[in-house]
A protein has these predicted regions:
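PAPS-dependent sulfation machinery
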Residues: 1-42, 47, 172, 194, ...
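Alpha-helix initiation/capping motif
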Residues: 8-12, 118, 142, 184-187
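Residue-level detector of alpha-helix boundaries and kinks
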Residues: 9, 39, 87-88, 118, ...
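PAPS-dependent sulfotransferase catalytic domain
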Residues: 16-34, 48-49, 53, 57, ...
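PAPS-dependent sulfotransferases, especially Golgi type II membrane carbohydrate sulfotransferases
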Residues: 104-107, 135, 139-257
């Protein structure tokens, strides 16, 4: 209906584009003026769904896409938001299932207006990656730009609820936490199914090796099985079993040696 209205009573799609641009100028312009700034960074995972539209609306804008190991993304969502409440996963289906392929497709849409970063490189060599980003954006590099400890956190709920407040700079502490997905049969099967749903072509296009990710999950499963066998052997002796149970009970009750 909107398209027909614009076609018959205005200048078609260009009228709609002008309207959206005017809306954005009003909103972002007020924020910039109030904070005495010249540039505005707007970031949300859901923008992956409308990259072509954003490119058309803002033809001079620069775009930054941050890619991450898809299993690390899955692990983060499960730990941060789902927390065992599995029906909540439906709310994150677009981010988990659709966004990766759309981000890959954005390369063709955005061309040289796109700067692509990988999370792993960013946390391991933040200064180098941020210098590359600054060059793309035409911004001067300032030493210490990777130290965000003095930067005020965004007001409201629009920030990282878990990790960012624990560090002064990008940290690699969480690089390997995704491997925990391999420790239980349920999460391991879910992670493997997730890789299948994304498709190997998409995972590779993101810069990751799907075969290596699957192998890592299975290797962790084998290690867990060895641990279980060792524990079973330890507890097979009745006296040792009693000692183990007593120790666990003491730890539960806060009793320490």
């Amino acid at each position: 209906a909107v398209e027909e209205f614009l076609t018959h009573y205005a200048d078609g799609r260009e009228t709609w584009l002008d309207g959206v641009r005017a809306y954005a100028r009003a909103i972002y312009g007020k924020v910039l003026a109030r904070n005495d700034r010249r540039r505005f960074l707007d970031k949300t995972p859901r923008y992956s769904m409308i990259v072509p539209e954003l490119s058309e609306i803002f033809p001079e804008a620069r775009f930054v896409i941050l890619l991450r190991n898809p299993l690390a993304v899955l692990s983060s969502e499960l730990r941060t938001y789902i927390k065992g409440d599995w029906p909540l996963l439906a709310d994150f289906a677009p981010d988990l299932l659709e966004a990766p392929a759309r981000l890959v497709a954005a390369r063709e849409v955005l061309g040289d207006r796109l700067c692509e970063l990988h999370y792993e490189k960013l946390v391991e060599a933040p200064a180098e990656e941020l210098q590359r980003l600054c060059r793309h954006l035409g911004l001067p590099w300032e030493p210490g730009l990777d130290d965000y400890s003095e930067t005020p956190a965004p007001r409201g709920r629009f920030n990282d609820p878990v990790g960012v407040h624990r560090h002064r700079r990008p940290s690699s502490d969480s690089l390997e936490t995704w491997r925990e997905l391999g420790r239980s049969a349920q999460t391991r099967a879910f992670a493997l199914a997730y890789l299948d749903a994304l498709g190997d072509d998409t995972v590779r296009a993101m810069g990751y090796d799907p075969a290596a990710l699957r192998a890592a999950l299975l290797h962790i499963a084998e290690a867990v099985a060895v641990e279980a066998e060792a524990l079973h052997a330890l507890c097979g002796d009745e006296s040792l079993d009693g000692q183990v149970l007593s120790r666990l009970a003491a730890l539960r009750d806060g009793v320490h040696d």
